[in-house]
Structures are given as C-alpha cells and as structure tokens.
C-alpha cells in the first residue's frame, strides 16, 4: 500500500502537511531506532519519553512520514497531525494491514482476573473444534507457529493489527484477545471488530491509572460498546455489574454463573486437589463436568469458555464438556511444582481478589494440622491502595512472607512497609530479597503445609529502578529444592 492510498478517506480529525506521493509504505512504527526507508514514524508522547524528540532521527533513518499531535516545521517529510493521535494510529494500522479483524472471529476478554485462563481455554476449545486460533495476551502472543513475548497484555495498535494480519496469513480463523482496561482507554483496540465480548469479573485494580473504580468500569464497558447487534456479550451473571454491562451493548446477551440463574450455570460443585467436578446446566439439560483446574474461580473460567465456544461455533455441548477434562492451566496460573516435600504452587495473583481466590482454594486442600505459607509482594509504581488489602487477605488464610515483586522505580523496603501496615496479627515475616523469601518459606514448611509463591506467575524477570534482572519463581523454587538433596 502506498502513502496516498493509506491516507485516502481517513475520517479522524487530522491535517496533512507536505506533498503526498504514491511511495510504498513499508511499516508503521514508534521505534525510531529501527526505522528504514518507507516507514511511517508515529511520534507518541509516553510517560517516560516523547516520540516527537526522535522525529528528526526517524526522518534521517528513512521515515517517509511522521504521525503526531504536534506539527514540526523542521521536518522535510509529510506530517499527519491530529489531536486524536491514538485513534488515528488505530485507523491507519487497521487500514495498512487490510482490516485483518474482519477476516477472523475475534473474541475479546476483559475483567480484573481470569483473562489469561479464559483466553487459553477458549483457544484450546476453538482449536479442538477445528477453528484454528491465535491468541494475544499477558503470557505470550500466539500467531500460528510464531510466538512472541513483548510484556504487553494488549499491544499498541500498530503491533496488534500486525499480529492479527499475521494470524490471517497463517490461515487462522479466530483471534482471542485479552483486552485490558488500559488498552481500551488508550484506544489500542479501536478499529478491531469484535464478534464476542467476555466479562470475567470486576474488582479493584489499576487505580494508579484510572481516576476511580467507576472510571475503571467505564473503560471495560468500551469492549461491549464496540460489539455489533450480531455479536455476543458473554457476562458473568453473578457480578453486581452484570446488568450494567448487558445494557451497554447491542450484542446478543449470554450469561454464565453459579449463584444466579444463567444460560450456562454450574451446580453441585465438588473440589479436590485434582480439580473440580460440577453439573453444567443449560436449557434444562444437565451435563456432568470435570475440570482439572482447581478452585471455584476456575469453574467460572471454564463456564465462560464453554459458553463462548458453544454459542459461537455451535459445537456439541457434550463434546465441549468432554474436552474440558483434558485442559491445562496456563503457565504461572496455580501451577504446581511436583518435586517439593509439600505442595508448592506458583501463581500470578497480584490483586486482592485474585489472591483471596487462590488462598481460599488452597486452604481447602490443606490436611489437618497444615498451614498455608504465602510469599508475596506488590508492584512498584502501581496502585498503592491495594497494598494493605493484600496483607489483610493473606492474614485470613495463613502465614505471610512479605517480599519484593517488581519494585520498578520505588524503594522495595517502602513497598514492603506499606504492605505490612495492613497486618493486625504478627503472623508474617519480611524478606525483601525474593529469592531469600522463597528459600525461607520452603525451609519452614512441613509436609502437611502448602506453599504459594504469588504475584509473578509466568514472568521470567524482576524490574528494579535501574535494571531488570532474570528471575523466574519456578526456577528459584527448583534451585532451592535441589540444594536440600
């Protein structure tokens, strides 16, 4: 596609400076370091740096146009200037990659917790039902044979559209996307045409980014506002906000749940260390179901995935129930470590609600006389209001070993002290070094205890103010256990 074609009929408020020639566009990018001839440079202003400061370098490296919110009279190339830069970026990216979402069945999952598990479950079921799918999410982006880890739950528009286009090129027929509230607010998902929207749950998170809980909910509502009247709005009907989300969309409502009446409802729940058994009720029929994923919150995740697949693909419900028995949890989601002297789990839980769900689940698995030992911290430069609450959650269920998560720009000791201010009882220990914290937790555990290492899950790094180091909770656990042999 050439520059003239790309800019033709763009309906975002934008002004073009310079002569538009039919020169071929090679790429859309925000990285001035990797610019080549034929690229369009998008000069975004971020928290840490301003892309406009690198526009001249981008032009020197071969950029044929610059997209920005600020006109630069010293640039010798075409400039596309708009006050709605994020929407303009989304529209240009979608057009450049030939609107790939129109060629896929696109499922968007939003919610404070559960997005990753639900997205992996849907991909698993879609693939099993001959609907080969890609995935864009927190752990990785799966684009056919290509797997990418870039650290973004919801990538920026240029990358997101590029990934969707790669799925089309790889002959995939569906895309499952984790849609974060931040990604929605920053318009990263604008010009993605969703066929299905899924709501897992809504609890406190990201209040460092959103002004209030109401604004956080409003952000998530955007996904459902994007659905057409032929789409599906799949909502957890046990949520207080369920009605609000269903009223915000033109799409066909589909509900799931445990406590309230729903299109897909679980009853007669039984839990064990080997998973959950329940009766799935749909239109008066009962389907006995076994899931290897433990905990009530994972029953909700399974229900969401079944509802989406059954409604969208019209698969046999009994077939889906049978498939669920062989699902596997995503990496770092209540992931068991098999070689320990007691049960050890790695989990990504980093919000009060997620931590409560995981601790509650694991406590039910404790043998008589056993205790739950929880290693956890809180991320730096993130919502500080949840730090005390995290301590209060863990205190309900067991012994806490408070440590560092990803301190980022904050002092680790300050974060730990803020967490510990939430404890009422002195049933905790402090080990700021995360490896030492894991070592200590394992050293005090008996064979009747359960150890939970929470907060980082699948992550293989730890972020400090001046450096990011390699750090994998699973590897550290194995290293500590091997030292006992």
Curated annotation (Swiss-Prot):
Pathway: Cell wall biogenesis; peptidoglycan biosynthesis. Its cofactor is Mg(2+). A motif (Meso-diaminopimelate recognition motif) lies at residues 405-408. GO terms for molecular function: ATP binding; magnesium ion binding; UDP-N-acetylmuramoylalanyl-D-glutamate-2,6-diaminopimelate ligase activity. GO terms for cellular component: cytoplasm. ATP binds at residues 111-117. It catalyses: UDP-N-acetyl-alpha-D-muramoyl-L-alanyl-D-glutamate + meso-2,6-diaminopimelate + ATP = UDP-N-acetyl-alpha-D-muramoyl-L-alanyl-gamma-D-glutamyl-meso-2,6-diaminopimelate + ADP + phosphate + H(+). It is found in: Cytoplasm. It holds the Pfam family Mur_ligase. It is an enzyme of class 6 (ligase). Carboxylation is probably crucial for Mg(2+) binding and, consequently, for the gamma-phosphate positioning of ATP. Its EC number is 6.3.2.13. PANTHER family: MUR LIGASE FAMILY MEMBER (PTHR23135), UDP-N-ACETYLMURAMOYL-L-ALANYL-D-GLUTAMATE--2,6-DIAMINOPIMELATE LIGASE MURE HOMOLOG, CHLOROPLASTIC (PTHR23135:SF4). NCBIfam families: murE, PRK00139.1-4. Catalyzes the addition of meso-diaminopimelic acid to the nucleotide precursor UDP-N-acetylmuramoyl-L-alanyl-D-glutamate (UMAG) in the biosynthesis of bacterial cell-wall peptidoglycan. Belongs to the MurCDEF family. MurE subfamily. This is UDP-N-acetylmuramoyl-L-alanyl-D-glutamate--2,6-diaminopimelate ligase. It comes from Chlamydia felis (strain Fe/C-56) (Chlamydophila felis). The lineage of its organism: Bacteria, Pseudomonadati, Chlamydiota, Chlamydiia, Chlamydiales. The gene is murE.
